[in-house]
Amino acid sequence: MSDQSEYKISKDDEHSIYASEINKEKLQNTASPDVDYGDTASLKIDPKVEKKLLLKMDLVISPIIGFLYLMAFLDRSNIGNAAVAGMTEALSLYGERLNVAVSIFYVLYILVETPSVVLVKRIKASRMLAFISFAWSMTVLFSGFMSSYGGLIATRLILGLLEGCLFPALNLYLTTHYTRKEQCQRLSYLFASAGLAGAFGGLFAYALEQVHAGNKEGWQWIYIVEGLVSFIGVPLCLFALPDKMENAWFLTREEREVAIIRRDINARYHGEQHFEWSEVRKAFKDPKVYVSATSQFCADMVLYGFSSFLPVIIKGLGFVGLQTNYMTIPVYIAGVISFLFVAWLSDRTQLRAVYLISASTVVAVGYIIMLASDSNAAKYTATYIIAIGCYIGPGLNLGWLNNNVAGHYKRATAIGIQQTLANSSGIVAGQIYRSKNAPKYILGNAFTLGCVIVGGLAYVVMFFSLRYVNKKRDERCARGEFDPSAIGDFADDFRYYL
């Protein structure tokens, strides 16, 4: 599907867009100054060298961004573990106070996503991520010293403000250094980190709950220790995460040359390197951004709700305490493995919609079982069915948007818009999955099932809309009709991923 998923180009454009040669002057102007590239008049990409380059990028970049997102996910979700470990009594979290504290995290979280992601390129990703990591680690650390409900609300707001800048920045970073056909697999590593946090976060918290030292209770040590561990991300970002692959410390001279050629090949995808408000406005006016945001909202509802009712169902099977945590592990692992495989397959086939629609169908079946059955065994089986598709939806849909928005600042804005609207589902989930509705959570599960159906329909709308545009562009190109004023993903030679 190469023609259907990349730019179609004219012969005159071949050198500037998809050439395998790059001139010496460009290399010397953009590459690391400590490398002498010699005669590079006819450089070509060696597949073996590119394979080594990608492997090295994966081995360095993926663990760093995976660690950041894993800790961020732990730090935002540890409120539930802390509440069980004694924070409820210590801070008087009675009535709906805990639900409010959970939901209020997303108020500033969703407000900062769009403006922060636009700033990534101007600030440099390594510096921005290091600052975010430092600030949120400090916030989590000092959460261990809270003494009132007001203090909890304040720390949740600050944490939301900081973590709202994180995920869009990580996602945009991946789109900067990986090609369109490589992105979903790498994005799956981020969601795998979230799954691992869900699988083992409870065990980690359980171990910390047993600590009673320094006049601190177990719930306080959860915050203190997790905050300290999060600090590891600061030096990793500052000293190990490259802003430009042509200057990456872990690449050889030959691999840096290939990195430069890859960047040149994808020049039109990355678009204008200087900030322009017109690119921001294009994102706000693009209908596909809002269709994507709608389906992302629906997919995120599954994620946020899933983590709420899973422990309750397992407790209903007769398991208690540490046993409950053990029983959640295989469910989360099933979700992680499923998404890693589907993301790899999606990049391999360069298809998106077919996997998203299939995942929605699977998740819907799981929720129907959850609502229709009174058997805890059947409900536990349903959690596996839901887990198989719950990461595919938000992960692959975000990757689909990444693929189909060209121009760095337009794409950055589109990511911010999508994530802002989608993460408002966190506020909703905190209100429809209430403890008084346990263990059936009929309201929450029924609402989420409705979201799954709406999200699936949004995927269908997106697929047929993009296929129609691709077909029309094929026809115009066949007639030799090109609109020279159309740029980015609106250009006649741009083909959307389907």
Swiss-Prot record:
One Pfam family in the UniProt entry: MFS_1
GO function terms (MF aspect): carboxylic acid transmembrane transporter activity; transmembrane transporter activity
PROSITE patterns: MFS
Transmembrane segment boundaries: 54-74, 100-120, 128-148, 150-170, 188-208, 221-241, 302-322, 326-346, 353-373, 381-401, 446-466
Key words of the record: Membrane, Transmembrane, Transmembrane helix, Transport
SUPFAM superfamilies: MFS general substrate transporter (SSF103473)
Transmembrane in keyword set: yes
Signal peptide start-end: none
GO BP, sorted A to Z: carboxylic acid transmembrane transport
Similarity comment: family membership: Belongs to the major facilitator superfamily. Allantoate permease family.
Protein name according to UniProt: Uncharacterized transporter C11D3.18C
Originating organism: Schizosaccharomyces pombe (strain 972 / ATCC 24843)
Lineage start: Eukaryota, Fungi, Dikarya, Ascomycota, Taphrinomycotina
